[in-house]
Amino acid sequence: MTKKSFVSSPIVRDSTLLVPKSLIAKPYVLPFFPLYATFAQLYFQQYDRYIKGPEWTFVYLGTLVSLNILVMLMPAWNVKIKAKFNYSTTKNVNEATHILIYTTPNNGSDGIVEIQRVTEAGSLQTFFQFQKKRFLWHENEQVFSSPKFLVDESPKIGDFQKCKGHSGDLTHLKRLYGENSFDIPIPTFMELFKEHAVAPLFVFQVFCVALWLLDEFWYYSLFNLFMIISMEAAAVFQRLTALKEFRTMGIKPYTINVFRNKKWVALQTNELLPMDLVSITRTAEESAIPCDLILLDGSAIVNEAMLSGESTPLLKESIKLRPSEDNLQLDGVDKIAVLHGGTKALQVTPPEHKSDIPPPPDGGALAIVTKTGFETSQGSLVRVMIYSAERVSVDNKEALMFILFLLIFAVIASWYVWVEGTKMGRIQSKLILDCILIITSVVPPELPMELTMAVNSSLAALAKFYVYCTEPFRIPFAGRIDVCCFDKTGTLTGEDLVFEGLAGISADSENIRHLYSAAEAPESTILVIGAAHALVKLEDGDIVGDPMEKATLKAVGWAVERKNSNYREGTGKLDIIRRFQFSSALKRSASIASHNDALFAAVKGAPETIRERLSDIPKNYDEIYKSFTRSGSRVLALASKSLPKMSQSKIDDLNRDDVESELTFNGFLIFHCPLKDDAIETIKMLNESSHRSIMITGDNPLTAVHVAKEVGIVFGETLILDRAGKSDDNQLLFRDVEETVSIPFDPSKDTFDHSKLFDRYDIAVTGYALNALEGHSQLRDLLRHTWVYARVSPSQKEFLLNTLKDMGYQTLMCGDGTNDVGALKQAHVGIALLNGTEEGLKKLGEQRRLEGMKMMYIKQTEFMARWNQPQPPVPEPIAHLFPPGPKNPHYLKALESKGTVITPEIRKAVEEANSKPVEVIKPNGLSEKKPADLASLLLNSAGDAQGDEAPALKLGDASCAAPFTSKLANVSAVTNIIRQGRCALVNTIQMYKILALNCLISAYSLSIIYMAGVKFGDGQATVSGLLLSVCFLSISRGKPLEKLSKQRPQSGIFNVYIMGSILSQFAVHIATLVYITTEIYKLEPREPQVDLEKEFAPSLLNTGIFIIQLVQQVSTFAVNYQGEPFRENIRSNKGMYYGLLGVTGLALASATEFLPELNEAMKFVPMTDDFKIKLTLTLLLDFFGSWGVEHFFKFFFMDDKPSDISVQQVKIASK
């Protein structure tokens, strides 16, 4: 019997209802009462029998208190433990006060939230909030779920068209949906610090500091404590800054006209509710559309850059003329009616038709609210940004297994110390402390910090290429990618298509490739081009819309005018009366237009789609368009039909299917698709680095195959699997580009022959063939051998990515962020390419920097006023942003730098402003110079903090379409992300290896070497500590190589190569230590009774062990540093390279007594010549032995082979 889940949501995997336990019943209270009571009884009544001294009192009580604190803190570390310790489970929602939520993967952390109850109109409402989403209890279904939105319920168009707005009491709806705002509470510094202070790592580090204090390492312990607290404080400040940034992403409430209770009223935008009717006007500079809406009447030009990242303004048209019985298709034909919250309306056209609802008083377009608050597109993006901050973490399961593996060695070392110490008669309390120190030494506290630093350095490196990431946990995924999928148009080819001419106009022409200019085209063709487009002219004169349509109209001579009119010299004025927007499902668009009082329909679309709508198909129709598509051109067919004169209402009632049937052919539009500059180089690099590159496009298969050959996705002869003929009998046919090879395929009974198909040809598959093959037993085999997918819909792109993931491959999808949203979200690594230029982005960055300086200057001015200090002068870079005056001496200079011509009138006005007296505020005991200098210093640093820190995400940086967003249109973003992904992976492996060896050597040093009486002096410990600090700071700074390697990084640590290398290197280190210790005892016999408490005194044992351990630390970093073929070699990491060289030089100089003064300063004792030779050779043996075993295991056991789907690329590339 399956367990019932109380919550229905895609982000919730499971849930449990909870009731709090009483304090006494909690595991950190009740079980400890008898333990404390037993200790008290033993202490006061049987002290001499059981405790026998203050040391054991401390051990027993310390262990008991530590265990109590540990159990008390466990609920703060794990939400399941918190539920177990603090709550009882129940199945009755009326009893429950809290609920435990288990989230689905990559949707934030699990959590316990309070269940709230409110009585409304006599009925009880039960709900809770989780991750800014509200969940309400539905008594009938016995489940919590988010409030239902009509837009998610597959509604009919008529459900929105008939809406008359809200009436009556809206208290219930306000409670149900909440405010239309982003309520992100900002905790105080101390609240956040308390949260960090109970984290397992922080508690463990403080516990270690306490142990070192007990062992009388005062300076070392207090310094460590200071460093730990400082690092946590810095992390808290960083989180606070990020939360404040998220808070600014909300839209400040402003007044909007809303149709409620059958009249227009002015309300604040935060009061909006779903199904409210609102008037949308041009948004103010600092504002935006307040929520998700659907246009009911009128039209708008919007800029969606703040949401999708795309800066090209889009035309949005209403659903007024859509058939009321049709289903709403938000991802299809109705996409053009959606206004997303957070976007900007640049221009609005009010409704032209009369309706039951009076026109808005502000002349805006009529729209209906679909979603509010965090449920909107912008709200979802902000939620992703907020909760992705928790996701930069190591693989917890692998890290835990790794630590358990190291603990085995720590337990063995502790057992040795206990046995040997007991034999030597050491104080047992001191022995227990030593044993605990050994066990804690193998838990590397640096591990999470180092791995997080690796991911953050990758984020910072990507930001320099204008690539931003909302889900940092995906960066290591990029290092494991098997399959790279690319859209064609706008991704591999440029957005700006070049208009080459018209084809197929004359039926008599023998040359099927003849191109006609606009001057040679008949008027009917010119009129279709002028009508079948969606370009709009803004009030400021800019024309917005598809770049391809802009190029076409410009080449033919049409000028776009206001109010859906076009004008062409010699042709006259053309008015577009109604548009049927392009649909990816229909693969065509249409318009109804009027020219010289004649009404006609103009249709434009894919040649094979238009072919089916023609009343008479011209001869050579297929030959003409296929001839151009084979050579890589983009081909669109034009068609039209005359319409009788009719009224506007009749035009509005026309059915799209009727308009687009019985058409007359008017020619083909031919465009050249230039490849992006970096497309060929990017695909070549991926092919050579064990990746499979495939193309998934909605374009024609012949064009797709041509472009795939140009960029290097396919090399050999290609067969296209498509429908066999015009009939709907589901029969398929493999045919080559020239149609000289054809192999029939019946999906109902045929199977794929590898020797005849996959071993001889590259394969391309169409969307039609994919549908026909649904459920075929060999579909996955076909996908494994397919290079190009053409004429596929957005849903099919999503299906392909999901299937490749199910087949066990790591997938990457690179698309344009508008048509490819589903596929981008399904891929392990989704990359949305936007259309920015580097120059434009630099200008935007400079603008942001100046805005930051302006805000900081205003804050500093307020700070001065609070301390009764004079206002500091305005810095020159932002002088033009403030009015002239005595405190703005650089005003004229700043205006000149911005290109303003300084007229005598401007100069006179500035002089007058500068001559005004400045109110001098009494210094109030503080010097005037210091605060002003502070302000200047802060301003100079504003906006320039670009280092190795992960950049703070802002709206407009990230696209809601994909986890990765490239603001540049460069395909090289793919290789940059893979490069950084491999770098992060390699960093992870190297950190595990280095920390493992350091911990193992530390366990050996704290046990066997310590018991032998070896102690190190302050100077020696300082040198060793500095080496480790420099190396740990430098090690993750290795930059990835420009060229992607054919080799692939290890995906995990538990394999023969990694574990074999760690254990073998450890064995080499132990062997050299044992050998040197043996040689030392020959010269300096071991004391029969070692005094472990004595002060440090130089000895041959101390000298030899310290020098060899110094070299072991060098070899640990140098041998396990992961450089080529993934990152720059160790010599390029200057800090680490010279640090290691310096320490190696110190060790060799000390071992050979090359500089006697150095040995004296380091507190080393003189050595015999024979011992110096043995010591030096042992140092070399230790280093080269470690190097040898590492390379042995790497050569024989490293699993760097590509997956089977990637191997095929190598095979075909070698044809």
Swiss-Prot record:
Disruption phenotype: Impaired mitochondrial transmembrane tail-anchored protein localization, characterized by mitochondrial transmembrane tail-anchored protein accumulation at the endoplasmic reticulum. In addition, a wide spectrum of phenotypes is observed, including induction of the endoplasmic reticulum unfolded protein response, defects in lipid and sterol homeostasis, and dysregulated protein N-glycosylation, topogenesis and turnover. Gene3D superfamilies: Calcium-transporting ATPase, cytoplasmic domain N, Calcium-transporting ATPase, cytoplasmic transduction domain A, HAD superfamily/HAD-like. Its main location: endoplasmic reticulum. GO terms for cellular component: cis-Golgi network; endoplasmic reticulum; endoplasmic reticulum membrane; mitochondrion. It catalyses: [protein]-with a C-terminal TM segment(out) + ATP + H2O = [protein]-with a C-terminal TM segment(in) + ADP + phosphate + H(+). Keywords: ATP-binding, Endoplasmic reticulum, Magnesium, Membrane, Metal-binding, Nucleotide-binding, Phosphoprotein, Protein transport, Translocase, Transmembrane, Transmembrane helix, Transport. This is Endoplasmic reticulum transmembrane helix translocase.
